[in-house]
Amino acid sequence: MSARRLTRRNLLLGSAALVPLLSRRADAFGEKSRFIPAVARHGGRWDLRLSGLRRIAWELQRRTSVEVVPDARPFALGSPELFEYPFLYFGGEGSFPALTEAEVANLRRYLTYGGFLLADANDGSDGDGFDSSFRREMARVLPQNPLAPVPSNHVVFKSFFLLDSAPGRLLNKPQLMGAMLGKRAAVLYSQNDLAGAWSRSESGDYEFDVSPGGEPQRELAVRMGINICMYALCLDYKDDAVHLPLILNKRR
């Protein structure tokens, strides 16, 4: 992996003077420079799409030059270990209890220091269930940075593949929602169950049907996942920094 792709991780570790640095374990296994999805543990059903995260990490390595560990590592939201991981997945089905004040403060610090959060409504909810709980907590974590629609010309739609929407297992909402810190999307939120489209069983079969678009929609969901991972890894992505030659090849 290039030094540029490590920018966000380095910022997190370099900025985390207020929390312990816990990188010895990662260094010992040669993992520090590899992409590993972290998963937010909360009081609800947070662990429904671990196979999807492992799969998107595998797809990221297969389709790009990013080195990965195809795993999904759960952490409490109050854990200082979050700061070792530039990408944090926060998914769930149904409502979940309020985060503690310590969890809210740690997640705010993580995002402020350069961490990235992908939220994913596994239940496809809108106004209730996971959606209601997540919006409630984001209003606590980033009260001055509300979720808003991400325009289709945002760099996340062209960070690797050229896309114009963000389908998942479902297509309830064609747009992503995002919370901006300056010019950076610190949070992206899908109500389409992105990881549900990625998930495979141990036998290798996809776990869930994709609706309404079937397998072409699943491929778009995988491409969107790769775009999001690439965006999460590159702190300084600009419109002119996208992989234009690869886009021109991959868009066909």
What are these language model-derived features?
Residues 87-131:
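Short alpha-beta junction capping motif
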Residues 124-222, 226, 251:
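An acidic, glycine-rich "communication" segment
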Residues 22-87, 94, 194-195, 202-204, ...:
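Aromatic-Pro/Gly-enriched surface loop or interdomain linker
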Residues 50-53, 57, 104, 108, ...:
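Extracytoplasmic/secreted envelope proteins and their assembly/folding machinery
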Residues 40-42, 90-93, 120-123, 150-152, ...:
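Active-site-proximal beta-strand/loop segments in catalytic clefts of secreted hydrolases
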Residues 1-18:
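N-terminal secretory signal peptides and thylakoid transit peptides that target proteins
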Residues 84-92, 159-166:
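Charged, often glycine-rich, active-site loop that binds/positions anionic groups
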Residues 72-77, 100-106, 172-174:
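Alpha-helical scaffolding within the catalytic cores
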